Amino acid sequence: MKIFNDLQLAKELIKFPTVTPVDAGIMKFLEKKLKLIGFKTKILEFKDGNSTSVKNIYARLGTESPNFCYAGHVDVVPPGNIKNWSSNPFKPTIKNGRLIGRGASDMKSSVASFIAAVSDFASKNKKFKGSISPVSYTHLTLPTSSR
């Protein structure tokens, strides 16, 4: 069973240019990491009309109740003009003790911290009562109708 470091995993997630609704391979990446902990996983794809499809991942560790479910998104808003950034927004940087990059504060670091915490918990509690289900998703933004 793999135990993950939250900062290292957050840096890896920031490298994915997951500007809504682009997946950029992050769901497959997360699936691989979760399977190393022992999760059963399923990537789900959703499409509404003419919109671009979005991918979500559902994973579950354990089969009993109660179930603890954590939901977090891994898409980011566009970075805008790259020239306005002091560093590449998809190249994680530590500056003055802070992690800088697209998704560092919303919410790739949170997803990374959850996975790291669960990996540590699962390594120490192989037969815990209940189950854990992280759900990671990208946002589906539908165009508004003009009036």
Please name every model-derived segment.
Residues 138-144:
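Conserved small/polar residues in nucleotide/adenosyl-binding loops
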Residues 70, 99-137:
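Alpha-helical metal-binding/catalytic segments enriched in His/Glu/Asp
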